[in-house]
Structure formats: structure tokens, C-alpha cells
Regions:
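Glycine-rich beta-to-alpha transition loops that act as phosphate-gripper elements at the mouths
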Residues: 19-24, 97-105, 129-130, 150-154, ...
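Alpha/beta catalytic cores of nucleotide-metabolism and tRNA/nucleoside-modifying enzymes
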Residues: 194-202, 211-263
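Conserved, mostly hydrophobic/aromatic
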Residues: 16, 35, 46, 115, ...
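Glycine-rich phosphate-binding active-site loops on the catalytic face of alpha/beta enzymes
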Residues: 41-51, 120-124, 129-132, 174-180, ...
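Active-site-adjacent beta->alpha loops and helix N-cap segments on the catalytic face
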Residues: 1-7, 50-61, 68-81, 104-110, ...
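N-terminal amphipathic alpha-helix/helix-capping segment at the start of soluble metabolic enzymes
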Residues: 1-17, 79-85, 262-263
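Catalytic cores of alpha/beta
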Residues: 25-36, 154-164, 206, 210-226
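Hydrophobic faces of well-ordered beta-strands that scaffold small-molecule active sites
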Residues: 14-18, 43-45, 94-98, 123-125, ...
Length: 263
């Protein structure tokens, strides 16, 4: 199974997010393959949930659309299994972004057993307090799955505590609030990333609010990569099952921007 750190071995990483089941699970599968061809180094697959508290309207609406198609967690595992097999198997790391509730309702042991089976490298759980990470991580680690920590602008003491315990990569949240596209990112990301790097040597990628190539380049200059969600989900929302070319072009332009940052 591809490990998260592999995503950062070829220079600065571009990490797109897609909401599973939005406009149908078959389209999600095809779009992941397209994003990989366009240069994605790792893909975050969102498991739709009825109360996604960290998400802005774009991803909330995608979750609602996906749930209305009747998509279930088992369907998402089946999709990942298909992505990982065959001549055109996806080999880059794939991680789930989900909330505590879907994992607990599905059953933690069963969830992480299937993650291992289909080739999920890690999970990101935005509503999980750091203090509760151990409980989930103890089950995840049995199955070789890393639990990615999010670090938002906060005190150095808290950054130290979270960074020292981090695994896979650190998801550095560019601004407080929910996900979504922002015209400007006002947080001093450079200082936060430098602080994180005092306490860990694992990669740090920045997300929340990045939508333009110049923003991705700026963030990748001070970190190890850029994460983009809402802008990708918006392309799928606008083009439905005909988003192939628009997605390819967008991901390719964002990948080129982060590579420029590392040049």
C-alpha cells in the first residue's frame, strides 16, 4: 500500500479533494483517475455526511447531492478497490476525509479493516479533538492506516503537542472557519509552518481557501504542498458528469503552480 509520505517524494505535492458519490460513484471513480493523470500526488476522498461541520456551502451541497443518490460507505470502499486493481491501477496514496459519526456508526474495526484491504493510506477527521485521537488511532494503526492531524492557527504549546504526535503529514489549516474559496488568505502561514517544523519532520501541506494557481504556489513555497477541495467540487457541481476536461486542466495548472514553488 502506498504510504502518505510517498506523495511528497517528487517535490511539492498537489492534493485535490473530491466528494465521493457526487453526481454518481462511477463519475467519482473516473474523476479520481483523471486527477491522477493530471498530476495529483495524493487524493482526499470525502465520505458524504449529513452534518459536515468543517465544510463550507460548496462541499456541504456536494455531500447532500451524494447522499441523495443513496451512496453508502460500502460503495465507496468498492470504488477504492476498483481504483487499486487492474492495468490502470491508481498507485498514489488515497486518504479518506470523514467525520467521527460515520466511522462509529459503520464500526471502527470494520472501517479500518476495509481501509487496509482496499488500500486507504490515511484518514482525516476534522471534528475529532486532538485529545481523542488515541482512541481512533489505536484501531487505525492495527491496519496500517495513519490518522492525519489538522493544525489551525493556535498557541505554540498546542502546535507542539499536535505536531509531535503527527503522522503521515500535517494538514495545516490556512484560516479559521469552514472550507471554501477565499480571495485572500490573511493568516501568516509561513510562521505557523515554521513552528510546526520545529517539532516534527513529517511533511506539512496547507489547505482551506486555496483555489487559484498563484495561491497554491504561495502556499507551496512555505510548505510541502497545497490541498484544494471546494474549487474541485465546484467544477464537478457545474459540469456534472461532463467534468473530465475541466478537471484535468484545473488539476494540471495547480500541479504546475506547486512545482514552480519548488523550483
Amino acid at each position: 500500500m502506498s504510504k502518505i509520505k510517498d506523495a511528497f517524494t517528487k517535490g511539492k505535492a498537489f492534493i485535490p479533494f473530491i466528494s465521493a458519490g457526487d453526481h454518481g460513484i462511477e463519475n467519482t471513480e473516473r474523476y479520481i483517475r483523471i486527477m491522477v493523470k493530471a498530476g495529483a500526488d495524493m487524493v482526499e476522498i470525502g465520505i458524504p455526511f449529513s452534518d459536515p461541520t468543517a465544510e463550507g456551502p460548496v462541499i456541504q451541497e456536494a455531500s447532500t447531492r451524494a447522499l441523495s443518490t443513496g451512496v453508502k460507505i460500502n460503495d465507496i470502499f468498492d470504488m477504492v478497490r476498483r481504483l487499486r486493481t487492474g492495468d490502470d491501477a491508481v498507485t498514489i496514496p488515497l486518504v479518506f476525509m470523514t467525520y467521527l459519526n460515520p466511522i462509529y456508526v459503520f464500526g471502527r474495526e470494520k472501517f479500518f479493516t476495509l481501509c487496509e484491504e482496499v488500500g486507504i493510506s490515511g484518514v482525516i477527521v476534522p471534528d475529532m479533538p486532538f485529545e481523542e485521537k488515541g482512541e481512533l488511532a489505536s484501531v487505525a494503526h492495527k491496519h496500517g492506516v495513519e490518522v492525519v492531524s489538522l493544525i489551525a492557527p493556535t498557541s505554540e504549546n498546542r502546535i507542539e503537542m499536535i505536531a509531535k504526535d503527527a503522522e503521515g503529514f500535517v494538514y495545516c489549516v490556512s484560516s479559521l472557519g469552514v472550507t471554501g474559496m477565499r480571495s485572500k488568505i490573511k493568516t501568516d502561514i509561513k510562521s505557523i509552518v515554521e513552528m510546526i517544523r520545529k517539532y516534527t519532520d513529517i511533511p506539512v501541506a496547507v489547505g482551506f481557501g486555496i483555489s487559484k494557481p498563484e495561491q497554491a504556489e504561495t502556499m507551496a513555497r512555505v510548505s510541502d504542498g497545497a490541498i484544494v477541495g471546494s474549487a474541485i467540487v465546484k467544477i464537478v457541481a457545474e459540469h456534472g458528469e461532463h467534468a473530465d476536461q475541466a478537471l484535468f486542466d484545473y488539476v494540471q495548472s495547480m500541479k504546475q503552480a506547486v512545482l514552480k514553488a519548488g523550483a
